[in-house]
């Protein structure tokens, strides 16, 4: 199975003409993140048959030199956003791994699908592309991974991500849930939740290579 087949199935089910129109106009007249060629990087860097973990984000960062198509990731050399800083703090506490770049391309190459629920945003306007059609697309992506793949770990941080839990077949996948790593909620159960070691324990138990959470590749 390839992402192209999945995309084809989704486009058979939904008409994205309206969304395509909105995006066409937005990219022509506004600053939109990520750059157009980076919108689908999550799928480019993590082929369908390599997906071992899915981490769901909300929408892309809306500042310059941040979003590049992977949830939570920022371009190398960019200051770490607060949620990502907390993710790294938990990684260090959990597995004693220190990372030196905010770019998560290495995770993507390891088999971690870093999927935002909405894949584009207008610069400086959080959630500006909510409701234009991306949610249908990402819902179908989660369903497809659940349906066609085996023993995938779905990491759902925060209420919006956890709304997708009902789409996941828990008889053949693992779901890890906690509050969001945002500074607003991290101390209410994200810190100490050990999502990285939990993920690797599950993968090893199902004869899969664990994720190298310290891997750093630059796009």
Curated annotation (Swiss-Prot):
SUPFAM superfamilies: Uracil-DNA glycosylase-like. It is an enzyme of class 3 (hydrolase). It comes from the Bacteria. One of its GO terms (biological process) is base-excision repair, AP site formation via deaminated base removal. It catalyses: Hydrolyzes single-stranded DNA or mismatched double-stranded DNA and polynucleotides, releasing free uracil. Its main location: cytoplasm. One of its GO terms (molecular function) is uracil DNA N-glycosylase activity. It is found in: Cytoplasm. The keyword DNA repair applies. Keywords: Cytoplasm, DNA damage, DNA repair, Hydrolase. InterPro entries: UDG_fam1, Ura-DNA_Glyclase_AS, Uracil-DNA_glycosylase-like, Uracil-DNA_glycosylase-like_sf. The active site is at 59 (proton acceptor). Its EC number is 3.2.2.27. GO terms for cellular component: cytoplasm. Belongs to the uracil-DNA glycosylase (UDG) superfamily. UNG family. Excises uracil residues from the DNA which can arise as a result of misincorporation of dUMP residues by DNA polymerase or due to deamination of cytosine. NCBIfam families: PRK05254.1-1, PRK05254.1-2, PRK05254.1-5, ung. This is Uracil-DNA glycosylase. It comes from Macrococcus caseolyticus (strain JCSC5402).
């Amino acid at each position: 199975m390839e992402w192209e087949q999945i995309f084809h199935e989704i486009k058979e089910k939904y008409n994205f003409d309206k969304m395509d129109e909105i995006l066409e106009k937005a990219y022509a007249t506004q600053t939109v993140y990520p750059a157009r060629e980076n919108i689908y990087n999550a799928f480019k860097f993590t082929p369908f048959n390599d997906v071992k973990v899915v981490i769901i984000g909300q929408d892309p960062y809306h500042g310059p030199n941040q979003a590049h198509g992977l949830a939570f990731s920022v371009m190398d050399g960019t200051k770490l956003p607060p949620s990502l800083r907390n993710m790294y703090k938990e990684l260090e506490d959990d597995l004693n791994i220190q990372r030196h770049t905010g770019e998560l391309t290495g995770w993507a190459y390891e088999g971690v699908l870093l999927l935002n629920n909405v894949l584009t945003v207008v610069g400086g306007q959080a959630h500006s592309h909510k409701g234009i059609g991306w949610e249908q697309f990402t819902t179908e992506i989660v369903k497809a991974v659940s349906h066609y793949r085996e023993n995938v770990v779905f990491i759902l941080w925060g209420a919006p991500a956890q709304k997708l839990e009902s789409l996941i077949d828990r008889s053949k996948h693992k779901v890890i849930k906690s509050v969001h790593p945002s500074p607003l909620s991290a101390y209410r159960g994200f810190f100490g939740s050990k999502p990285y070691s939990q993920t690797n324990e599950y993968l090893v138990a199902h004869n899969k290579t664990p994720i190298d959470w310290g891997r750093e590749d630059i796009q």
